[in-house]
């Protein structure tokens, strides 16, 4: 588990140094898993390191400085730390379900945003930074000296975030899209050979630098026009009045602007639907169910309702329900969730609710979730939510069907 996660403040190098010094052991455990996963996919470590160094230009100097800080703090070589950051999404892609009720479709007239974070497990996840063959999820608070404050969820020891909220009232999430191209033999190999971008790192950049959803999307778009995402997938940004969804594959990009309407994404493209796999039943079921739930209470969507939707077991409980369950650690199942309620008048008072563990368990126990606004400080966060213990207690594949 992670012992000192994770409030980071100051310069990017200092933020990285803090992470490296606090999580050196955990980062090493994740690196072991990272290289083992890539090995099983047929990658050669030296070739990947070489490509990682060549891809350094994908990151701005602030990000490079943060990675250097992590490397120094954890006493890990910079090339390996850089490569881990660049290609993390290739080894451990985000699955996930995202829903948003934008503007007037929210009960307060402002946006409500939800993401369930789903991931596969691996028999390489066996260190203290893991539990039941899954990465431990923790709450992170980032306060860079020249950017917005961000609260979100991350895997222990990983700098990129799964989903988060900024003090400008911008919410964000990501998910992979299962495409015909991705299923073809050798496509994953291409993700290393080309300069490719990590969605989770991109949304963090958008949250730190963007003052609204469109601006956050504009911040990440120049890079996407030059280089594809590491795997096909979506990025979702939302503020009080507007949502922006970016779909990207290796050669295609599409964007949807959402105003006073509902939207959702599972692991299937909507705009680039000709690329989607027809046999991905889970993504189809979850996407349809998200729209059913949102349409039924359009204009009355609240944080409490989104939390309820996060626990939804229709089409399951199992891999086809929004709260996803499995019978083997290798299946894609829900590990954490976040619901964000934007305050358009006072963005710093926007609220985020985070559940660590299986949503149907964690949302029902105060020990496993937190609801706060953007003024949260280190003393406001329960130790179990910072060190991963709450996640370990409330991660299970057994469905919780009690009221």
Outline where the language-model segments fall:
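Structured soluble/peripheral alpha/beta segments that form catalytic or ligand/cofactor-binding pockets
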Residues: 154-163, 167-172, 177, 218-254
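Internal mixed beta-strand/loop scaffold within catalytic domains of large alpha/beta enzymes
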Residues: 87-192, 335-340, 347, 351-354, ...
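Amphipathic, alpha-helical segments enriched in basic
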Residues: 42-46, 147, 191, 195
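Generic secondary-structure boundary/loop-capping signal
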Residues: 162, 204, 371-373
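Helix-start/capping segments and mature chain N-termini
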Residues: 158, 165-223, 279-289, 293
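C-terminus-biased signal that marks the final domain/tail of proteins
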Residues: 1-95, 104-106, 209-246, 259-403
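Amphipathic repeat-derived elements
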Residues: 133-141, 250-252, 256, 266
């Amino acid at each position: 588990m992670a012992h000192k996660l994770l409030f980071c403040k100051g310069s990017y190098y200092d933020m990285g140094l803090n992470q490296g010094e606090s999580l050196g052991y955990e980062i090493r455990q994740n690196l072991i898993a990272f290289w083992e996963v890539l090995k099983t996919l047929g990658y050669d470590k030296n070739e990947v390191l070489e490509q990682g160094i060549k891809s350094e230009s994908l990151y701005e100097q602030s990000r490079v400085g943060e990675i250097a800080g992590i490397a120094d703090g954890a006493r890990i070589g910079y090339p390996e730390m850089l490569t881990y950051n660049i290609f993390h999404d290739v080894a451990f892609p985000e699955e996930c379900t995202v829903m948003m009720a934008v503007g007037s479709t929210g009960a307060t007239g402002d946006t409500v945003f939800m993401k369930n974070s789903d991931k596969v497990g691996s028999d390489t996840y066996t260190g203290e930074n893991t539990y039941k063959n899954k990465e431990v999820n923790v709450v992170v608070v980032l306060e860079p000296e020249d950017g917005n404050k961000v609260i979100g969820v991350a895997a222990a020891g990983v700098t990129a975030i799964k989903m988060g909220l900024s003090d400008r009232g911008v919410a964000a999430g990501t998910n992979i899209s299962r495409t015909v191209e991705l299923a073809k033999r050798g496509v994953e190999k291409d993700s290393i050979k080309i300069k490719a971008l990590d969605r989770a790192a991109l949304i963090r950049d958008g949250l730190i630098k963007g003052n609204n959803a469109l601006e956050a999307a504009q911040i990440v778009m120049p890079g996407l026009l030059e280089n594809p995402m590491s795997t096909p997938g979506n990025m979702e940004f939302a503020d009080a009045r507007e949502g922006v969804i970016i779909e990207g594959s290796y050669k295609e990009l599409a964007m949807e602007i959402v105003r006073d309407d509902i939207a959702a994404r599972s692991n299937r493209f909507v705009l680039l639907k000709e690329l989607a796999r027809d046999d991905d039943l889970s993504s189809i079921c979850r996407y349809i169910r998200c729209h059913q739930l949102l349409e039924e209470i359009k204009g009355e969507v609240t944080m409490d309702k989104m939390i309820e939707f996060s626990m939804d077991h229709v089409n399951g409980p199992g891999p086809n329900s929004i709260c996803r369950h499995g019978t083997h650690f290798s299946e894609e199942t829900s590990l954490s969730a976040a619901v964000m309620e934007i305050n358009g008048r006072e963005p710093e008072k926007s609220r985020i609710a985070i559940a660590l563990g299986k949503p149907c368990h964690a949302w029902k126990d105060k020990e496993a979730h937190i609801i706060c606004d953007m003024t949260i400080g280190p003393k406001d966060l329960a130790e179990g939510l910072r060190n991963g213990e709450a996640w370990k207690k409330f991660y299970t594949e057994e469905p919780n069907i009690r009221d």
